[in-house]
Amino acid sequence: MSDIYKNKICVITGAASGIGRALAITLAEQGAVLALSDINETGLSETVEMVGGSNKIMNDVFDMADAEAIASYAQKVEQTLGAADYVFNVAGLTRVGNFVDTPLESMEKVMDVNYWGVVRMSKAFLDQILSKKGTLVNISSVFGFIGYAGQTHYCASKFAVRGFTETLAQELKGTGVGICSVHPGGIATNIARNAIADKLPDNGASREEMDAAFDKMAITSPEKAAKVILKGAAKKKQRILIGSDARVISLVSRLFPVGYSKILEKYSGNNVILGDKP
């Protein structure tokens, strides 16, 4: 796989941390040309420093909810580096709280970044990807397979990403383009710790206990996730599962489309995120 990405133009959103940063570092090691972006300017600068100066790099700061910024960014990438070979839509956010406690504008923000951000990036770069017979990689989640209490907004956004990506793959069948839907399980990133809590669970669990519960679920490193994604993208796999937990959840959700929640509760044990007693 080491030569597949050499000199390929790779666009990565969410490159300031987590999976996005790990993808940037791994691709840089393989000689890729990088276009990195994030809303977090400080984190993005740190990623650029980690990548080093041996690769051609663009780095831009913008909000995935800004449609005009994304359209301009796609033009800038093509004019500066050339048409993109790979686009990795990684950027995302979440919140904590049940639907009844979550303001509508908070739901809209999560959808705007997680779903519409992916749609905007896909639209903006699609002509470039088609011209290169490249690959579009959209990050969904295991929460694109199952509902999960306290994550109404996040699950809705990730189901939407999955549906959009799988349908786009059907529409572009025969074009030579790869369309990948990626479903990570628990990844050791800061997305949960950065999440705003609209309301904590009624079981009295503190924010620290919730963060600890997320950490316990995070069984896969960003570096491992990046390697799995790149291996799958190189093969233009339509669905990429990351982690043993993702494989289990995918299987259980298909075998028990209605009763999976009870099965997964037994599998995972008591969980302060779900509102169970600690």
What does each of the following model-derived ranges do?
Residues S141:
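Residue(s) in the substrate-gating loop at a strand-loop-helix junction
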Residues E41-T42, V61-S72, L104:
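The beta1-alpha1 cofactor-binding region of Rossmann-like NAD(H)/NADP(H)-dependent oxidoreductases
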Residues S122, S157:
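Active-site helix of classical SDR
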Residues N98-F99, P103-E108:
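Substrate-binding pocket helix/loop in short-chain dehydrogenase/reductase
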Residues S2-L34:
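Canonical Rossmann dinucleotide-binding motif of NAD(H)/NADP(H)-dependent dehydrogenases/reductases
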Residues Q30-E46:
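Conserved glycine-rich Rossmann-like NAD(P)H-binding loop of the short-chain dehydrogenase/reductase
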Residues G174-S244:
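SDR active-site lid
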